[in-house]
């Protein structure tokens, strides 16, 4: 029996595509352009896993489809290759991280090519290539020139084990680092920052123009966190000092009964009384050991210390105690809050814990029992009494501005981007600090500032990166004899990935980041597919850099990615015991259809979980390609379910996809191809063309494959296969199973050319309509026959067919026909006596 020999056919076509540069990006100016982008991978030592090809297959299907529709298609791949794992490996082994990275890239590329993706490898990029990061550094110098890259002494998330500071977004909810799970402590340090806050409003507003999942837009909106309210100034009793708080509810100022400063607030030491000094110092130290996320956890017990100082509430002159508490962050807002415990749950819990005054200023609720967080008329609020929320806010803001103690204010939760890392394996920041106190950017003609090769990449121990150890590279002298020192921090991994999609457009340009006309031709990216885990960090950073490049005239669009799609996660097979603990697959055996823990004998429940080394349920695509073939993997991952759903891996499903491809192969090896159309497959063929075309456009690949299966089932019932329908089917199959399609195309079309650019088939709307219908024939209201007739016959034609049917003739023999009622396309009712 014929079968699809993937081990022979797939390498054959991969070789053909590579030798013929089949997927080189088209440059025909008369054709429309289509840019399909994957989130490029970090080339880890573990290699590709089966989650990677899901998104890659989706963009590949679109790319192959668009080529056949006459588009120039840009479908590139590259490597996000800077990062901590390579550096950690280098420190552990003494090997160069560049060598480790090159080996990993070679392995990734081998695996990707084995899956038959139609990438234009002439455009391959690598963020660690000096010819690439020259332009990453160039963008930084432009940000620096515009005042958007600056140095600041800021409390950072310091990870001792990693020897570096990490961004807020890289701290997990439990206060450990995303990479490695190490403890994170707060520590003041000189850092490079990027002023992403200058773009907050545009980053927020321009989301409306994007075809992105609403959930991702909401995550960005929440991260940017726009708030409208007022700044209020509180004087500190018996001093000439004051502090400012931001509040979204200035109308509740009469209910402010205490104030809270962040432990790091600049005023804390100056206002703390002698009696409270030790308690305040101890508390500040304890707070420094916690991450921002741990400090602001709503579920944690409230802690704080009174400073011994009082503030004056500007609206009523009352003295209110000033506390410090770790749930207030120096980096958020002004680092100070006014507490209105009657109407805020956190303030109420804090007030109850430390026996502080609670004054209701909104009618409703019982503030002795709980904070009242609904709205209501104002009470205990002097000139605001009786007013609703909106009117009271307006009146209070007007009062604050008239009295010179406050003003209307818009704030954002978004913080400036902590851009420096104290590591070796990253882009050097192109800045020189001179002994006369000035700093300058490395001139463009000296870029790239190449990362020096060294075996000594251990952290310096001073908080600086290992580059601080390399004095030959570090120390420079200006033409006028002034000595300088290069910046030792390196850029975060996010830097190279914030603009890589631009370099694909013109990857070999030595004069500029990319040619303006080419950028105009290809931007914005038409479809960007990747994991939802990048919703905030990568996508927000890339949008920020793109808007900056738009402002300085480098790119022609305001946004980088017009359409975004997040593929779901492929979950692994895993097992849980009665305590819901996960059991590794190598500790499980199957008996009589049930699963048992080999060590304890306990029966286990099968439950999908994220693939992990510890559960030993990671599926390597190399193994799948070896056993089943790349086309099987592609078809299976697209047929598992909706592209955005998280679905468990299944060997049975994989086998089902392989059987489908074998059935396709046998169909073309067992049926005679004919040039005359019998019409038997007209409807199902044209339905298949219509359905697959529409489903590809909508990224509903699972239903497209289901329709291909329907056609195969119908075709198998026929003795012969109309050659034009055979060709059309192969074309529809090609984006999903390109190797098999190429092989079948050569046998059927016999053109000697790849199927990759053959014009996509079209469907005939008139053929989608049923040509025949089934009607019932009744005698005196009882069904006596069912007949298949041509659609839309007249009443007279139906009557004639019914009365001439042999079965009906025998039923009415010898009887008088009183009346015949015909309903086109439905029934004929014969009344006899």
UniProtKB/Swiss-Prot annotation:
Renumbered ranges of motif 'HIGH' region: 41-52
Binding site for ATP: 613
CDD domains with a match to the protein in the record: Anticodon_Ia_Leu_BEm, LeuRS_core
Primary localization: cytoplasm
UniProt-listed Enzyme Commission number(s): 6.1.1.4
Domain of life per record: Bacteria
GO cellular component: cytosol
Motif ('KMSKS' region): 610-614
Keyword rRNA processing attached: no
GO MF terms held by the record: aminoacyl-tRNA deacylase activity; ATP binding; leucine-tRNA ligase activity
Gene3D superfamilies the UniProt entry points to: HUPs (3.40.50.620), Isoleucyl-tRNA Synthetase, Domain 1 (1.10.730.10), Valyl/Leucyl/Isoleucyl-tRNA synthetase, editing domain (3.90.740.10)
Biological process, per Gene Ontology: leucyl-tRNA aminoacylation
Keywords, alphabetical: Aminoacyl-tRNA synthetase, ATP-binding, Cytoplasm, Ligase, Nucleotide-binding, Protein biosynthesis
Pfam annotation, one family: tRNA-synt_1_2
Subcellular location: Cytoplasm
InterPro entries for this protein: aa-tRNA-synth_I_CS (IPR001412), aa-tRNA-synth_Ia (IPR002300), Leu-tRNA-ligase (IPR002302), Leu_tRNA-synth_edit (IPR025709), M/V/L/I-tRNA-synth_anticd-bd (IPR013155), Methionyl/Leucyl_tRNA_Synth (IPR015413), Rossmann-like_a/b/a_fold (IPR014729), tRNAsynth_Ia_anticodon-bd (IPR009080)
Top-tier EC class: ligase
The reaction(s) this protein catalyses: tRNA(Leu) + L-leucine + ATP = L-leucyl-tRNA(Leu) + AMP + diphosphate
Family note: Belongs to the class-I aminoacyl-tRNA synthetase family.
HAMAP family (UniProt xref): Leu_tRNA_synth_B
Official protein name in the record: Leucine--tRNA ligase
Gene name, Swiss-Prot/TrEMBL: leuS
